[in-house]
Amino acid sequence: MHLQKLKYLFLALFLWQCSPSEQYEVADNPLDGGRYFIENSMQGNFKKAKFYIVEDAENLALFEKMASNYFGLDKEGRMQIRLASIQINEITAVDSTMSILNYQNSFDKEVHKLRIISTPKGWKVDLKYTYGQN
């Protein structure tokens, strides 16, 4: 009897270890989708930031370039970005499935725009809009 309980305990622990440990919060609205992406990118948490982008070949290539640029900065440059605050200037709904987020951060004070799209997996950022011709 005791051995049986022990087997179930080990099975439960094994299954718990096999389950994905990094569950990220699904963005329920465009503001959250954009904010989660921006915050994690600025913190250098590109694994989590990647969860908040539309996953297609072009977006993934742009995302990898963005991450490479971040890690190409020296330690002080990355620290300045991590410490910068985010200012959301405006969010505009294009339609019920797409919004444009206009923001800047206190580090570069440059205005940036993100297109955020509703997907079955929550609101996700489309980097093609930001880095393409818009």
Predicted regions and their residues:
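Short solvent-exposed beta->alpha transition segments
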Residues: 26, 31-32, 36, 41-94
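Sec-dependent signal peptide recognition
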Residues: 4-11
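Exposed beta-sheet edge and beta->alpha loop/turn motif
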Residues: 83-134
